[in-house]
């Protein structure tokens, strides 16, 4: 079984979000599971630098100009690169300029990605041809459409990491991207009078996966589907929509081997975690106090992530004796709100605006509770890292958060399945009730340790996801 992942980023070469973490780990897990998985990426500068030994496979003239297809390896995974400097050799973000305006030629830049994904199934590399083209998010959404236009030379899977980003472009670009105009209708890639790369993936793929079972159900409902609910409900009824949970890359995220921590630990040596907490309190300007539960946020600061609720609930958290450490950036209003809280409560609130991968490990190793109060969350990786590190996740019941965290209710404690704290309604009062439950459990150290051990014993490895995808691919053959 030969599988080509078509996507726009891959950790650690280039990362703007969780998609990169998935592509950085899933193909390697699939190779270990017996699938010949490779990755197709645009040759953005950071990616090109990370694979300096890439060799020329072929050169082609395309609707988007002259391209060179390269092939190399990264961490044991075969990587194809679309080398087209006129499209991809730009500093900063792969999607927008320094003023945060989307590049005006994104329609060509990402149509080309989908086109090359299709051409790989038609023999672009004469020595390797995928049985399945697995496209990820809107950037690769045209791959299933091009495959459909070419008579489906390979099966296609389209994974939705976040339905909110839809890749919308003016209809006149149909000529530029060289897809048949017959594809431009409601039973195709047309959406609200424009081309939607996301809808192309949803409509033309042989199977759609979402990154959690709950999110796969949620996106058939209007409040989560951004207008795609009709199509997604139809795909669900046809048995062509399912959810596969993302995993944790244990080579990077494991408290037992994480060299970014002051002290490494396992579920059998949790007392070592205390040194990480002490170091984190010092680094964030918090009072060094092992008796105060340390709550943490590592997130984009947006309303989608529910960070306005954290700001609203913060006085209640602090009144009960808790501390907050926050690492993130985003909405200027939220940034100012958290910075003001840090100034008002020195020693209790520590804030770092920005994102630093290494420091996020230190927070995960040192905090007691990781807050993930998202309004919607397709899968979420932060809570999985929290479980792995014995940093109990406090989450809202939505998407992948609902699939991965079990509330520390009396019943779940008795059944030995409690792993964190879960609240239902997206408001500060509901969040505060969950915070209150966390304080109650914190007051019972032996019970807290029991839940930590339960959380750390859960298996969200990529091997589980790789097996699920392998079974899906074989069903499609």
Swiss-Prot record:
Listed binding positions for ADP-alpha-D-glucose are 15
What InterPro entries does the annotation carry? Glyco_trans_1, GS/SS, Starch_synth_cat_dom
Enzyme's top EC category? transferase
Q: Which GO terms describe its biological process?
A: glycogen biosynthetic process
Q: Which GO terms label this protein's molecular function in UniProt?
A: alpha-1,4-glucan glucosyltransferase (ADP-glucose donor) activity; alpha-1,4-glucan glucosyltransferase (UDP-glucose donor) activity
Keyword presence, Transferase: yes
Q: In which pathway does it act?
A: Glycan biosynthesis; glycogen biosynthesis
A Gene Ontology cellular component where this protein is annotated is: cytosol
* Keywords for this protein: Glycogen biosynthesis, Glycosyltransferase, Transferase
Coiled-coil annotated spans: none
Q: Does the keyword Glycoprotein apply?
A: no
| Gene3D superfamilies (alphabetical) | Glycogen Phosphorylase B (3.40.50.2000)
Q: Which domain of life is it from?
A: Bacteria
Q: Which reaction does it catalyse?
A: [(1->4)-alpha-D-glucosyl](n) + ADP-alpha-D-glucose = [(1->4)-alpha-D-glucosyl](n+1) + ADP + H(+)
EC number per UniProt: 2.4.1.21
Instruction: Report the function annotation for this chain.
Output: Synthesizes alpha-1,4-glucan chains using ADP-glucose.
Q: Which family, according to UniProt?
A: Belongs to the glycosyltransferase 1 family. Bacterial/plant glycogen synthase subfamily.
Q: Tell me the protein's name.
A: Glycogen synthase
The UniProt gene name for this protein comes to glgA
